[in-house]
Amino acid sequence: MALIPTVAAFPLQRAFIPLLEALTAGLPRQFPALIHSIYLYGSVARGEALPGVSDLDITLLLNKPADSEALQRLEAWRQAFQLEQRIVSKVDFDIGSV
């Protein structure tokens, strides 16, 4: 049996809250049938991110495996979102399905 370790809850840094609100509102609105859940990890999740320096690490779980068209649409959304958000150096999506 494999165990997934859990980590302590860290408070989000105030500077990153608008970014996370935009992401968690925008992705499900744009992809309502596709997005199952959104997970944050890395320095932003730990409360150690540096504005303008740190990247945003996101795991997306989809309701089903994405076809090439869905992956292209997710990538286009990620690129546009990254250009709009100056507080992080880049936005990374790791994508899986349930």
Model-inferred region functions:
Residues Q72-V98:
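Conserved catalytic core of two-metal-ion nucleotidyltransferases
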Residues A15-L19, A66-R73:
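Short amphipathic alpha-helical segments
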Residues V7, V44, V53, V88-V91, ...:
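Extended aliphatic helical segments
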